[in-house]
Amino acid sequence: MRPDAFPESDLPHVPHEPTGGRATLLLTGAYLGLCVLLGGGTRQGLPAEAVLQLLALPLIVHGLVRWSARPRSTAARLALAWAVLVPVGFLLQCLPLPPSLWTTLGGRAELVEELQAAGVAVGWHALSLDPDASLRAALAWLPPLALGLLTLGLHRTQQVRLLQGVLVIALASAVLGLAQLAGGPESPLRWHAVTNVQAAVGPFANRNHLAALLVLALPLEAAQMINAGARIVAGEQRPRRTAAVSVGIVAGVLLLLS
């Protein structure tokens, strides 16, 4: 990993930075924090998820406008194409098919027998055995699609700052998890009705969700520490951020407790 893989926030200004970049960075960070705060439930179709999905729609439009104004690499084009094809695939599964077609698909014979036994006409049915679940899966793809598009529209320096924001979110979640452990199963800091009451869950309902966030933060923290070490070796004597180290310590403790 190169020493400059995770530079400090005082990177030099890069010319030709798209206008509105700072506002987009703040918007992306705020939406990311909102996703962590409101997401992570154990059930699908929660009102909080609907709020995040509705907010994602104008953000996707804004992200497309920002992304179209920047040079687009082949990798970015392929990533965007894949990100769009995934929810489209879910939506296609919800389209109704004629009986002559869907009854020939795998796993449909038993369903046809049950419909006939119940006296229900074998009419048009979707490709998906659970169209509602397929629709929820497509809608669940909106927030990550919005975040991805917004991030592609950011300058590299701003993308690094956004990653540093992920470290801050992970640190806050880890500290919240420790406070939940200290407060016990009835801690008011557990705001999900269905949750792991004997474990640290942070802003989520499931301890595995918190563990996934902390695991995601570990390589970011490692890059931050490697960059800081390289700058110290280079003779730069400026104070170092301690957030990355704190994330590593707290994350290690919580991973052991999980």
Show where each model-derived region lies.
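Alpha-helical transmembrane segments of multi-pass inner-membrane proteins
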Residues: 2-39, 49, 53-62, 87, ...
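N-terminal membrane-targeting/anchoring modules of bacterial envelope and secretion proteins
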Residues: 42-43, 47-48, 74-77
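Canonical alpha-helical transmembrane segments
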Residues: 59-72
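Extended N-terminal export/anchoring regions of large proteins
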Residues: 73-74, 124-134
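Cytoplasmic-side transmembrane-helix entry/capping segments in multi-pass membrane proteins
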Residues: 74-84, 163-168
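A cytosolic-side transmembrane-helix exit/cap motif
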Residues: 75, 101-105, 184-190
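Extracytosolic (periplasmic/ER-lumenal) interhelical loops and adjacent juxtamembrane/interface segments
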Residues: 100-129
